[in-house]
Structure formats: structure tokens, C-alpha cells
From Swiss-Prot:
Belongs to the ATPase alpha/beta chains family. One of its GO terms (biological process) is proton motive force-driven plasma membrane ATP synthesis. It is found in: Cell membrane. GO terms for molecular function: ATP binding; proton-transporting ATP synthase activity, rotational mechanism. GO terms for cellular component: plasma membrane. This is A-type ATP synthase subunit B. Gene3D superfamilies: 3.40.50.12240. It is a peripheral membrane protein. It comes from the Archaea. Component of the A-type ATP synthase that produces ATP from ADP in the presence of a proton gradient across the membrane. The B chain is a regulatory subunit. Keywords: ATP synthesis, Cell membrane, Hydrogen ion transport, Ion transport, Membrane, Transport. Has multiple subunits with at least A(3), B(3), C, D, E, F, H, I and proteolipid K(x).
């Protein structure tokens, strides 16, 4: 029989301090009953011989020292069944779509563990997102964790939605699902997400967790863990390939800082807790493929860099854990280019595992390298032209400058509903490279030039 205690000594922000009257486990689920009879849920955050610290998910409004506390002896679990696909849930896992509660086939603890490195399968399968700057130059591979580093006011949410509805594995009929975790978003953003999912039919293969800006901040710490627990069930129990998209991890980290301040912890860099790196890793490292299992988890975390500062602790620490990054550029956005992904500072560390013959096409790496090289040189020449004038540039430099402009207009820029195949992306790449003399294509093997260059493509097909 569980006991209820009226031993609250202090209420501070989202935290309740309770005098310890029985052995209590870390992470244990707590129920707190207010004077009006309302029951609020919480979790044991810290425990010692004298005091138990409880974080309350629904906020501490209405609580007093007379409120009763009950320790359940259990941890937070996520109810799971195949019918969860297509559902919209709150940041704490409760139905938000007006539907019935989930009738679970299994219940899983939400505090999962990273996949054992010895049990991991190397990510190899190419995921086509339909976005050229990702598929062509920063390829996403199944089982990878590839974040988007963005800034306030940039269209990263539109990019996330486009990936959610277009992502697919080529040549495979295996089931594909999306787990979408939104943290600290506004009501307007939530309506935008839901309208897009319903308009495109993507909701039929998605599970959505919505934590709004006016929801308790502590709930934000649960949202990605609930989403990942759901993804693990879909991937490793139901053999599905799951893409997990979080937006915005910056709001998640702000909640961590808020909790640390409420507990009066010694802060780390810029006031964030010293364990933020470890906490982020417990989320990111739940991506991957397990040997002997058919399913996989691929992660697409999205975070807004405060002040567009890539050295800020949140993007800085995320970059150490994840396998690359996609950078959303304010400069490209000002030019009206969508998606404004700047390929120069972007990187996919697992790209080589998922491209080439048998995955995309044999010329993929060479075309990508050549596009990178001349686009980067063209961007440098823009700075030079601004100083000395375009007329002072050599003919070669003018050609590369024009190439960079065309690259942004034709390769980077595409419609919000435009789903390009990898062949279309590579074809656009070759058309751009055909602007340059063949002697300048130094990073591409002659056999690829003879086979795929627009000048020879028709001849190659006839032969």
C-alpha cells in the first residue's frame, strides 16, 4: 500500500521539495494532490537522506505546503501499440487530437539507453529527401543523426516539414514512419505543422508530439524521450524505418538551464548546466541500426542558434555528438532562395557510406566535390569583386562567379513541394558544370565526363 505525505517544505518554480519519509528511487513517478482535489504528476529529480526534489510536469500553480504527495514506486512509461501511428499527442504523451487514450500492447520506460556500439550496424542506405542540397552534397544515410543549425526567423520548420513528407528509401517497400517532436513552439506554428501534415497526408505515417510555448517548461524535457521511446518501438518491434525530427532543441536546452537554476546548481558555459552535453547525448545516441534488426532510427534535430552564433554551447555541443550539420543561411534567405541551406559549412560525415554505385550513382562523389569546389571559389570571388569591381576579374573568374550565381538559382533553390529524385539532382549538377570547360573539371574522372556530361550524354545513350 502506498502512502501519501504532507511533508512539502518548499515550492520553487517547477520544483517541490519534500522531506523524505521512505526510500525513494531516482526518476520515480510522483502524484501530488492539491487542496481542490486536482492531481498533478511529477518525477523525482534528486534524492538524499533528508530531502526529495520533485519536478512537476504540469507546473506548481495551485500547490501549497498542505498538498499531499504520493510516491508510486514506478517510473514514467510510454503506452505503445501499432495504432499510435497517425496520433497527435501532447509533450507529456497524452492525446491532443480528441481521440481516445492509447490502449497499450506494451509500456516502455522513456529513459532509454544508447545503442551498444558492438551491436550497431554501420549506416549505409541512402535516404532521399527530395532536397538537392541534402541529397546531392550532404547526403542523409539511414541510421544517421544529422542536425539543422538555423537562426530565428529562418524557414527551418518548412524544411523539416518537407523532409517529413518526402523522405524515402529508394527501391525498398519497407514501412517508413516519422516521429515529429515539437518543443516550445507557438500555437501559430503548431497550426502550421498540423495543416501541412493533414494537407499532404503525411499524418497517416506520423506520430506527433506537440509541446507548446505556454505548456510547462519541464514537460519539454520529456518530449524527445517520449518520441524516441515511440521510435524505438516502431523500429525494433514493428521493423519500420523511422525518421525522428525534433524542433527546437534550443527550447529543450533552455528548459535544462531553467531546471538547473531552480535547483541552484553551479552553472557551466553561459549559464547552461555542466551536464548538458551528457543530456543531449542520451537523446542523440538513441539513433542507429541494431545488428539482426530490420528497423532503423534516423534523427534530424533542428536547433536555432542564439544570435546566429555557431560557437554557442547548444550547436557547439550538438556538433560533437552528431554526424555532421546542415547550416541554414540568413544571406541565402535574404536572396529569396529556398531552402537556404549553405553547403559550404554544412557536412554529412556518413555521406560516403550511402552514395556511389549500388546506392545513388557512381559519379555522385565526384560531382559533389566539383560543385563544392567551384561554388566555394565563386563565393570568395564575390568578396574580391566587391572590392576591385567585376571588370577587373579574369575571364575564368567571371565564369566561376556566374557558376556560383546559377548554382544558387538552380541547384539550391527549389519549390517547397518540389520532390527531386537523386537522378534529377545529379542532372542539374552536370548541367551547371557544363557551363565550364572540360579542362576545369579536375575532380571528375574522364570516364564519368564521357558518360554523364550533357555534351556526351546523348551519344552515350545511343552507344
Amino acid at each position: 500500500m502506498t502512502k501519501e505525505y504532507k511533508t512539502i517544505t518548499e515550492i520553487s518554480g517547477p520544483l517541490v521539495f519534500v522531506e523524505k519519509t521512505e526510500p525513494v528511487g531516482y526518476g520515480e513517478l510522483v502524484e501530488i494532490r492539491t487542496a481542490s482535489g486536482e492531481v498533478k504528476r511529477g518525477q523525482v529529480l534528486d534524492t538524499s537522506d533528508e530531502i526529495v526534489v520533485v519536478q512537476v510536469f504540469e507546473g506548481t500553480g495551485g500547490l501549497s505546503k498542505d498538498s499531499s504527495v504520493r510516491f508510486t514506486g514506478d517510473v514514467i512509461k510510454m503506452p505503445l501499440s501499432p495504432s499510435i501511428i497517425g496520433r497527435v499527442l501532447s509533450g507529456s504523451g497524452r492525446p491532443r487530437d480528441g481521440g481516445p487514450p492509447i490502449v497499450p500492447e506494451v509500456e516502455r520506460e522513456i529513459i532509454g539507453a544508447a545503442i551498444n556500439p558492438a551491436s550497431r550496424e554501420k549506416p549505409r542506405a541512402f535516404i532521399q529527401t527530395g532536397i538537392s542540397t541534402i541529397d546531392g552534397t550532404n547526403t542523409l544515410v539511414r541510421g544517421q543523426k544529422l542536425p539543422i543549425f538555423s537562426g530565428a526567423g529562418l524557414p527551418h520548420n518548412d524544411v523539416a516539414l518537407q523532409i517529413a513528407r518526402q523522405a524515402k528509401v529508394l527501391g525498398e517497400a519497407e514501412e517508413f514512419a516519422v516521429v515529429f517532436c515539437a518543443m516550445g513552439i507557438t500555437n501559430e506554428e503548431a497550426q502550421h505543422f498540423m495543416a501541412d501534415f493533414e494537407r499532404t497526408g503525411a499524418l497517416e505515417r506520423a506520430v506527433i508530439f506537440l509541446n507548446l510555448a505556454d505548456d510547462p517548461a519541464v514537460e519539454r524535457l520529456l518530449t524527445p524521450k517520449l518520441g524516441l521511446t515511440t521510435a524505438e518501438y516502431l523500429a525494433f518491434d514493428l521493423d519500420m524505418h523511422v525518421l525522428v525530427i525534433y524542433t527546437d532543441m534550443t527550447n529543450y536546452c533552455e528548459s535544462l538551464r531553467q531546471m538547473g537554476a531552480a535547483r541552484e546548481e553551479v552553472p557551466g558555459r553561459r549559464g547552461y548546466p555542466g551536464y548538458m552535453y551528457t543530456d543531449l547525448a542520451t537523446n542523440y545516441e538513441r539513433a542507429g541500426i541494431i545488428k539482426g534488426k530490420k528497423g532503423s532510427i534516423t534523427q534530424f534535430p533542428i536547433l536555432t542558434m542564439p544570435g546566429d552564433d555557431i560557437t554557442h554551447p547548444i550547436p557547439d555541443l550538438s556538433g560533437y555528438i552528431t554526424e555532421g550539420q546542415l547550416i541554414v543561411s540568413r544571406e541565402l534567405h535574404r536572396k529569396g532562395i529556398y531552402p537556404p541551406i549553405d553547403i559550404r559549412p554544412s557536412l554529412s560525415r556518413l555521406m560516403n557510406s550511402g552514395i556511389g554505385a549500388g546506392h545513388t550513382r557512381e559519379d555522385h562523389r565526384a560531382v559533389s566535390d566539383q560543385l563544392y569546389a567551384y561554388y566555394a571559389e565563386g563565393c570568395d570571388l564575390r568578396g574580391l569583386a566587391a572590392i576591385v569591381g567585376k571588370e577587373a576579374l579574369s575571364e575564368r573568374d567571371k565564369l566561376i562567379l556566374e557558376f556560383a550565381d546559377q548554382f544558387e538559382r538552380r541547384f539550391v533553390n527549389q519549390g517547397r513541394d518540389e520532390d527531386r529524385s537523386i537522378i534529377e539532382t545529379l542532372t542539374i549538377g552536370w548541367e551547371l558544370l557544363s557551363m565550364l570547360p572540360e579542362t576545369m573539371l579536375t575532380r571528375i574522372d574522364d570516364k564519368f565526363i564521357k558518360k554523364y556530361h550533357p555534351k556526351y550524354a546523348g551519344t552515350a545513350k545511343k552507344e
